């Protein structure tokens, strides 16, 4: 029997339905990471300042 958390609508249900032998891909865990990563890598806020 699979028990779900009280606020299951806030979290992906795929994680709770997963069996232990099954692999979860990064795209299933973070579906927007592929779309955001080019912007995050080019973001000036994440670069080391030139005065350091």
From Swiss-Prot:
Coiled coil start-end: none
One Gene Ontology MF term: protein homodimerization activity
One Pfam family this sequence matches: Crystallin
Keywords, sorted A to Z: Eye lens protein
Family matches, as InterPro entries: Alpha-crystallin_N
Domain of life: Eukaryota
Function: May contribute to the transparency and refractive index of the lens.
Family the entry assigns: Belongs to the small heat shock protein (HSP20) family.
Assembly and oligomerization: Homodimer. Aggregates with homologous proteins, including alpha-A-crystallin and the small heat shock protein HSPB1, to form large heteromeric complexes.
Protein name: Alpha-crystallin B chain
Organism placement in taxonomy: Eukaryota, Metazoa, Chordata, Craniata, Vertebrata
Underlying gene: CRYAB
């Amino acid at each position: 029997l699979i028990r779900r958390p009280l606020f299951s609508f806030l979290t992906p249900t795929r994680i709770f339905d997963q069996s232990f032998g099954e692999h979860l891909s990064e795209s299933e865990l973070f579906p927007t990471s592929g779309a955001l990563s080019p912007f995050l890598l080019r973001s000036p806020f994440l670069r080391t300042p030139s005065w350091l």
